[in-house]
């Protein structure tokens, strides 16, 4: 399905979801090859034996004509998996190698994971280390901010990190977004933040 909501997490369910994504990717690639083969046939170009065998899978027995393959998707299928509020559940238990392994390999499945938690440390370190982005909403826990800055933003001092955080979250519902690939910090999605040198 193009979208699905599951109430409970299990490794088996995630495995099924990822397998379905893998099948969709393979179907897309095979259909792309079949379309090229069909077009080659329609131009009366010479076909290999393997191509002829594949072409006959497109033969419509009712019309005795070759049906042009049609893509199910308009482009290579990508997937977003949202893991919401799983802190304290078996999904995040220490040593859940399955979930960590899937997240590590997610790019091969053209999949992005969005992990939403009430507190960053509800998510195991192994998963946190895989994050390319982090969105932090308002908190008064200065110790947490200091730990997060040391763990994730080595290009900023803890003081700079906290200054940016205070600026980014000064309005209700605003958040600080850290892009670890670019070493970039934003207020919400569109305002890139910079540290200004203090004037003497």
Language model features with spans:
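Intrinsic disorder/low-complexity signal
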Residues: 15, 23, 33, 50, ...
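P-loop NTPase motor core of the ASCE superfamily
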Residues: 77, 81, 95, 145-200
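Conserved ASCE/P-loop NTPase catalytic core
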Residues: 27
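Conserved P-loop NTPase motor cores
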Residues: 1-13, 31-160
């Amino acid at each position: 399905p193009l979208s699905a909501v599951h109430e409970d997490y299990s490794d088996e369910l995630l495995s099924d979801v990822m397998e379905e994504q893998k099948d969709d990717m393979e179907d897309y690639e095979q259909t792309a090859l079949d379309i090229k083969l069909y077009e080659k046939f329609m131009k009366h170009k010479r076909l290999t034996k393997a191509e002829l065998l594949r072409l006959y899978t497109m033969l419509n027995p009712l019309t005795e004509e070759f049906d042009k393959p049609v893509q199910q998707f308009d482009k290579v299928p990508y997937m977003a998996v949202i893991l919401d509020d799983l802190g304290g559940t078996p999904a995040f238990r220490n040593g859940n190698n399955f979930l960590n392994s899937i997240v590590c390999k997610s790019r091969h499945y053209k999949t992005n994971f969005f992990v939403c938690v009430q507190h960053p440390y509800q998510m195991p370190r192994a998963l946190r280390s895989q994050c390319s982005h982090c969105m932090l909403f308002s908190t008064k826990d200065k110790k947490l901010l200091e730990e997060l800055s040391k763990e994730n933003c080595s290009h900023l001092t803890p003081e700079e990190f906290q200054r940016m955080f205070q600026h980014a979250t000064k309005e209700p519902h605003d958040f600080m977004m850290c892009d670890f690939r670019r070493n970039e910090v934003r207020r919400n999605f569109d305002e890139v933040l910079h540290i200004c040198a203090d004037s003497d």
